[in-house]
């Protein structure tokens, strides 16, 4: 609650490109940009505009600030090279050793996107002098966030995963590569510039159940790649 806020309270804010685009006053002591892929182009129009919006996080910082950026993301590194920023830039290597991942015994971090998230957690934890044992304990017991690769049911035969936060093909790739015999429910609003770039090696694992008013667009994108069925709404798809 507000009553418990002190000068040492740490606020963690997930700021979207929409919020950052026109931001002039928002300034953080620590900032992190994990990755950049073509997204929200229906608003930003170009990938360049989208990158500029995300980099407001760093542009608004001062010399006492620290920015964590993905060392392995070409778009991020190109932007860093082309500009000078006041804050200290820490480049995070997201290629975590598999043996290191096994320390945590948490299947949530087996996907490459969550390995990427974990690599940032580790680097930021170092800056806050968090003890290694405390970090390991927290990560071991982390259950994940709602709607983000969230396992809502599991037995020996089936896992039901809610990944509805993935609102584009690119953000869905990890789940499609990570699992076998996938029954993929998809609908909603297609995103401008979005491409289904999954390797052909995974096509045989996936069956698409497409629903909603925009199903024609999804069918056009997927019909030559994976087996699909179409439905008028989610209820019919589930039945």
Predicted feature locations:
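Short, charged/polar "capping" segments at the starts of alpha-helices
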Residues: 73-78, 97-98, 191-194, 214-220
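Flexible active-site lid/hinge loop adjacent to a nucleotide/diphosphate
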Residues: 5-91, 96-109
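C-terminal helical cap/extension that packs against the catalytic core
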Residues: 195-239
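Beta-strand->loop->alpha-helix junctions that form or flank phosphate-binding loops
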Residues: 86-99, 136-140, 150, 228-235
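Short, structured coil segments at secondary-structure junctions
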Residues: 27, 83-85, 178-179, 204, ...
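Short internal beta-strands
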Residues: 67-71, 185-186, 205-213
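A short acidic, amphipathic alpha-helical/loop segment
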Residues: 22, 56, 78-79, 171-175, ...
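Nucleotide phosphate-binding/pyrophosphate-handling subdomain across enzymes
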Residues: 107-205
